[in-house]
Amino acid sequence: MLPSQSPAIFTVSRLNQTVRLLLEHEMGQVWISGEISNFTQPASGHWYFTLKDDTAQVRCAMFRNSNRRVTFRPQHGQQVLVRANITLYEPRGDYQIIVESMQPAGEGLLQQKYEQLKAKLQAEGLFDLQYKNSLPSPAHCVGVITSKTGAALHDILHVLKRRDPSLPVIIYPTAVQGDDAPGQIVRAIELANQRNECDVLIVGRGGGSLEDLWSFNDERVARAIFASRIPVVSAVGHETDVTIADFVADLRAPTPSAAAEVVSRNQQELLRQVQSARQRLEMAMDYYLANRTRRFTQIHHRLQQQHPQLRLARQQTMLERLQKRMSFALENQLKRAGQHQQRLTQRLNQQNPQPKIHRAQTRIQQLEYRLAETLRAQLSATRERFGNAVTHLEAVSPLSTLARGYSVTSAADGAVLKQVKQVKVGETLTTRLGDGVVISEVSAVTKSRKPRKKA
């Protein structure tokens, strides 16, 4: 028999659609943490990746209009926290989530905040060397801002006691971990500056995770360190731990113990300095006593030497010594004067103008001879060129032509006659012959006929 009520029968499409609606309406938005794998970004700009943990995984999509708000580039293996909607891709029946927002999870988020704050403060110049204060040398009082129960305080006090037991230490106890720690650290720094009891501050704590050290990555703490008039030595964690406070502080020490080393003087060094000072004092006293003794001996000797006879003998001896010195000085002076005179005579002989005059005269004679020879040569050449020119002129001169029997006739205006048409009857002409001039009057003009050319 058939049951009284038939069960609902779904098609595959309807089943997938029903499941999708149930997921979207019943689950809504959820927060999911996991590790990114298989991250891809096609040309569309959408992100496709898988979120997984130790035992499961889920496919994810983050569309371009959502991923453009993400402030970091997701990497394979990165732990993230996403806000997403659960859905189902109906054509394939694939269950997936649509990511709306993404941020690093755990230390990843803290590291991102660390880098952002570091870049911000660096851009403002809080890390610049020009703002760093010099540490006092030596320090007369050290202030320590840390937990009163932490190992860092114990290490600092132990080092200071070993190196410089007489150095005063003022402790400003504060929390170094937790939500209240940044505010307490800031107040401790401000209090130390207000009381102005110490000339250097150590701000720090022992090692720990990034979350444990996060108070020293707080912007308020960084700005308080930067504003401190008292030089600040940061001593946070171990040598590999670097916080924002390290960048802002006037000096970064890798550990609290190292910070104590930096601000204190070595006791052994102090003892050596004291011993050196005592030795210098003893030497000064010995020198002073020896000097006084020598002075006393001199005075005593002078008193013994004050007898008149001794004084007279000393003066006689002094007079003889002075006479010898005077004679010796006069001889030396005369000798030096003679030598000086000889040098002057030699210099004068060297400066005698007679040899120079003789050389100059010889040079002038040579130049005169060369000039006369040059002029004679140039005159001979000029004469030869002139003779050649005269011969050439005579060869081409009209006078030579006239001497051979030719004549030149010119009109009254001086124009040379070349044709009979230039002459009129009754005109006066001038004819130049080889030995004179003939003036004549034209009585008739006859033009020669040109000979006919043979046919």
Swiss-Prot record:
Record keyword Chaperone present: no
Keywords annotated in UniProt: Cytoplasm, Exonuclease, Hydrolase, Nuclease
A GO MF label: exodeoxyribonuclease VII activity
Keyword Membrane: no
Domain of life of the native organism: Bacteria
Pfam family, one: Exonuc_VII_L
Biological role: Bidirectionally degrades single-stranded DNA into large acid-insoluble oligonucleotides, which are then degraded further into small acid-soluble oligonucleotides.
Similarity comment: Belongs to the XseA family.
Subunit-level organization: Heterooligomer composed of large and small subunits.
Protein name: Exodeoxyribonuclease 7 large subunit
Organism field: Escherichia coli (strain SMS-3-5 / SECEC)
